[in-house]
């Protein structure tokens, strides 16, 4: 009995430590105080400023958010396509080739991100490429691609390797075998890799800071994402208080996506159980 109470207490303590900072941030997004330590005075001033297009800080935050989302979605799509095809190609390659590919994908995951960022900078400078949106996009793809590969690989290993050959024997073309046999079997891993790529891109600062240039919503200026904008503001002083309501918006948007994905996965799992039960009957 005591062990159960301690175990539950430990779990609740961990959850409290995880979510208490977010709850505090939510509360102070409704405070008019610029510094959290200055007390709490209820008001919607920060929310009004954030949604006021005439405010410079609001323009900077929304521009940074737009840049962040564009880079995250585009890089996630590219990483998912390349990582999925790479995992499928490695799965049907010879064992020696599989080991080489496995090693090359493990190195970026275990290596420090600063090493990857510096390597990209050296490569772009060596080939004479001007830093812009495309160099930033390549950096984010390189960052996310190994994680997509590692997300898809376990699903391929769970799949019967003879399914693809059986589809070809039954008259399917290689393209049909890929789209109608392999992709559906690995779809959960592909989707997980896509979400992980978006998360990595949204959260990244080092690769972004080293590989960005002008473009996107920033125009002729250097591309600002939320992470680089916060870092730039920290150099001049405290983080703009208008970031608090923006953080709350992002939190609830991510929460809604997680809830929808969980509901979809549960429905899919239940449908698969019903189908297997009918097949066994």
Where are these regions (language model features)?
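Interhelical loop and adjacent transmembrane-helix boundary motif
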Residues: 46-58, 202-267, 274
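Short membrane-interfacial helix/loop motifs at transmembrane-helix boundaries
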Residues: 20-57, 212-221, 281
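Membrane-cytosol interface at the C-terminal ends of specific transmembrane alpha-helices
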Residues: 130-169, 176-182, 193-197
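Non-cytoplasmic
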Residues: 25-34, 140, 148, 189-232
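N-terminal signal-anchor/first transmembrane alpha helix
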Residues: 1-25
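Transmembrane-helix boundary motif in ABC transporter permease subunits
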Residues: 3-4, 73-105, 262-266
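C-terminal transmembrane helix and the adjacent membrane-cytosol boundary/short C-terminal tail
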Residues: 2-10, 153-164, 168, 178-181, ...
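Generic hydrophobic transmembrane alpha-helix motif, especially the helices
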Residues: 102, 106-136, 188-192
